[in-house]
């Protein structure tokens, strides 16, 4: 019992701190809207406002556009700043991982659909981590629709999109399936 006491105290402290922890309150000045990119699929789009050329932030896997809440407003001094939460995450729609729903080209098409719906012309796209493949998909297929691409920590296969070897579709489908399993209360042990 003498050795268990410190562990019990530590466990109690962790539980107590968990009870005290609250969901962070987003106090950044932005508008939230939902853009329908295809039937039954709506994406959450944050608009931090600003003047100047458009700048669109795309978060990495598992994140939402709210990842950029801390610093996006600083860019609004020189740009009109947006953030898109990709399908399958956050408040955006969560379609089943089938029929290429999570391929790089499909995710890139979602970005283009948001741009079209909001009349955003030639933005600079800024993508973190796996969003690099979305950027590469858009930039390689429609270079005339973007003013530039900025890769943040995207030095993986995701940033080097090659339509002949679409890694992202398989990986995103697997990630989505596993997230759905966890949320349903079970995890596949494979």
Language-model features, listed with the residues they occupy:
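Active-site acidic short loop of glycosyltransferases
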Residues: 40, 49-52, 77, 116-122, ...
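Short, hydrophobic alpha-helix immediately C-terminal to the catalytic nucleophile
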Residues: 69, 112, 136-140
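Conserved hydrolase catalytic core segment
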Residues: 80, 121-163
